[in-house]
Amino acid sequence: MSASAVITGSGLYTPKEAISNEELVTSFNAWVDLFNTEHSEDIAKGEIEAKTHSSAEFIEKASGIKSRYVINKAGILDPHRMVPEIPERSNEEPSVMCEIACQAAGASARRVRYWR
């Protein structure tokens, strides 16, 4: 008799932090102001175009998204970064994606009562 694998459930990982369109736009518009100030001479010469502000309404209309779950909200909303700040890990440590997968798998297994 041969053994076979069966998928009996699925898991989901949802980050604890969320960013609303309003929060994202506030941060993005601050970045736009920083960019335009930093590049004001090139913008005045016509070498590059000035960035323009966005709005929460535009994001919702264009994407249908009102809020998104994120890892490291502070890093994403920092107009000097605009990306998550996730420390580099050694090759001996599990990756962020591995941790996410393990949490999702654990949630799935608990639902089907393999783990308690």
Where are these regions (language model features)?
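Conserved "HGTGT" condensation-loop signature of ketosynthase/thiolase-family condensing enzymes
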Residues: 1-116
